[in-house]
C-alpha cells in the first residue's frame, strides 16, 4: 500500500466531486439544496434519502482527509472539524458548480479553461488550511 500524501488525498476528493457533478449534475445540485433529513416517517422521496446518504459519505471522506492531514502536521491543527467539513464541502462544490455554469464566461473573461479555473480554486482552498512551511 503506497503512502498517500495529504495533498494527493485532497486532489482525489476534488476529482471525485468533479466527476460526480459531471455524471449526475441534477443530484450534485440536489446535495447542495435543502433536503428532508427526517426519514422516520414515509413522507420523503427515495432520491432525498439517497442524496442524504451521498452527502454523508462525502462528509466522511472530507473528515478522514482533515483528521489525517492534521495528524500528519500537514493541515492546521486549529480546524474545528464539523464546521470545517461543511465549509469545505460548500467551497469545493461552489467552485465546481460555478465552473460548470459559467464555463464560457470563464474562458472569455479570464482565458482559463473550466479545469484550469477549478484547479486554481482548489489550490486556494487547500492553501487556506495547509500548514505554512517556512523554507
Task: Please provide the spans of the model-predicted regions.
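Alpha-helix C-capping/helix-to-loop hinge sites
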Residues: 3, 72-73
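Secondary-structure edge/capping motif, primarily at the C-terminal ends of alpha-helices
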Residues: 1-3, 35-42, 99-103
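Short beta-strand "wing" residues that participate in macromolecule-binding interfaces
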Residues: 77
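C-terminal peripheral helix-coil segments that are non-catalytic and often amphipathic
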Residues: 19, 56, 60, 64-72, ...
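Hydrophobic alpha-helical connector segments
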Residues: 1-27, 81, 85-88
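Conserved acidic
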Residues: 2, 6-9, 50, 54, ...
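Hydrophobic alpha-helical transmembrane segments
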Residues: 2-3, 31, 62-66
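Short secondary-structure transition hinges
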Residues: 18-61, 74, 83-85, 111
Amino acid at each position: 500500500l503506497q503512502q498517500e500524501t495529504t495533498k494527493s488525498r485532497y486532489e482525489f476528493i476534488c476529482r471525485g466531486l468533479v466527476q460526480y457533478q459531471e455524471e449526475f449534475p441534477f443530484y450534485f445540485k440536489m446535495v447542495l439544496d435543502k433536503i428532508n433529513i427526517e426519514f422516520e416517517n414515509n413522507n420523503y422521496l427515495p432520491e432525498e434519502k439517497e442524496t442524504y446518504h451521498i452527502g454523508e459519505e462525502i462528509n466522511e471522506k472530507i473528515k478522514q482527509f482533515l483528521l489525517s492531514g492534521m495528524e500528519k502536521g500537514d493541515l492546521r491543527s486549529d480546524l474545528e472539524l464539523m464546521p470545517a467539513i461543511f465549509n469545505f464541502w460548500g467551497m469545493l462544490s461552489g467552485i465546481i458548480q460555478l465552473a460548470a455554469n459559467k464555463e464560457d464566461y470563464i474562458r472569455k473573461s479570464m482565458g482559463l479553461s473550466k479545469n484550469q479555473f477549478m484547479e486554481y480554486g482548489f489550490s486556494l482552498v487547500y492553501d487556506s488550511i495547509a500548514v505554512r512551511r517556512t523554507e
